[in-house]
Amino acid sequence: MRSHRRPTTVLVAALIAILAFAAVAVAANPHFLRASASGPDRNGELSVNFKIAGLGDNETITVTASADATAVYACRNNGGNFPSDPKKTEVSGPVSASGDFTSGRNGQVSGSLTLSPPATTLSCPGGQRRVLVSVSYSNVEVTGGGDTAAIPGTFSRVFFDI
């Protein structure tokens, strides 16, 4: 009788090990359930929202949002007007933001990252201050856990018509 128990015990142990590894393999498959963007807001910032599934419980993941951005800055006088020939500049380049997010008991993470307009070095003369005239974001995407989600469209806002 003992000879029959030993193979059964080994078989049960092997099945438990296989199921444990299968659960880890399924949990280690991060993927985006959704990704979207909204804005730009009144500060020219774009909000990138996402939901990732396929993580283990209480697993921390680094998520990065990125885009190609173009911003126009100009000098505006203290009266709130632009001179007839305003000093202005256009700045283009990649922008990104990253954050660490921890999954809950369901192996999912929902979050948001904020992209800011590219910085400028525009210097305004006395009596004037630099303002953001317009901003545009394209090729927006969010990455995390080895997966990438593209967010189609161009997200633009014009603050002043100069």
For each predicted feature, which ranges?
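Mature extracytoplasmic or otherwise solvent-exposed domains
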Residues: 27-162
